[in-house]
């Protein structure tokens, strides 16, 4: 019986373990697969979210870098504008200094030359040298030895030089062109006249048609203008001679800012429409475009 019981126990043991295994295998297989798939999907979602966060972070960094670059560009543009304004101021100061120096040299040369222009042009604009009645020593008779006579002649010569200087102060006074008024006449009539200043916003740039074709003038000095249509051909009024070059003249017809303001005032009083460009052909100083000629 014992052997039989042991046999029986041994026979029923596997059935007991089979029952225990069936209890653990009660969850269906498709639910296990779904749980596995859910874990995989969660991992994928987490990786996608991490990638999105990294992309957003990179985008924010790029936006901040762009803002910094824009700020640096704006600062560079401001520095460039400041440098350009300083350069323009330096150019204006240089032009003013050059104009003042040139005017001082011309006035000094005029005074030292005794009324005769050193630049080779006649101060009266007619192309003929003005001869002073100065008696050379060779023409003085030998019997004239009285010091009073010599002193009298010196006084007469000084008076002649002073008269020439007074007339030579105004180049346009000696020989005014037909139908034109000299500068002294303008100054005498400008008393009490409201001067019209040039306004770039409402007035066009003046023109010049001295060569037959109308061309725009360039700014010169403090409010003045210079013609751009001067050529190397001969003109009615020669340009001043260059001080450092023997056979060359200064290029361009020039007009100072004060003269241009008086011209605008005169034209406005005569009823000229200042919204149209002014032709400065007939208003330049008495010198012109023959720059490269032999000066005798």
Curated annotation (Swiss-Prot):
Principal subcellular localisation of the protein: nucleus
One annotated Gene Ontology cellular component of this protein: nucleus
Disulfide bonds: none
Keyword 4Fe-4S appears in the UniProt entry: no
Keyword line: Coiled coil, DNA-binding, Nucleus, Transcription, Transcription regulation
Region of interest (Alanine-zipper), ranges: 55-90
Subcellular location per the Swiss-Prot or TrEMBL entry: Nucleus
Biological process terms in GO annotation: regulation of developmental process; response to ethylene
Single GO MF descriptor: protein homodimerization activity
Alphabetical list of Pfam families matching this protein: GAGA_bind
Coiled coil: 66-97
Domain of life: Eukaryota
Tissue expression profile of the protein: Expressed in seedlings, leaves and pistils. Detected in the base of flowers and tips of carpels, in sepal and petal vasculature, in anthers, in young rosette, in the lateral and primary roots, and in the whole ovule.
This protein's domain notes: Alanine-zipper domain is involved in homo- or hetero-dimerization via electrostatic interaction.
Family: Belongs to the BBR/BPC family.
Quaternary structure, from the entry: Homodimer. Heterodimer with BPC4.
General function of this protein: Transcriptional regulator that specifically binds to GA-rich elements (GAGA-repeats) present in regulatory sequences of genes involved in developmental processes.
Protein name per UniProt: Protein BASIC PENTACYSTEINE4
Species for this entry: Arabidopsis thaliana (Mouse-ear cress)
Name of the gene: BPC4
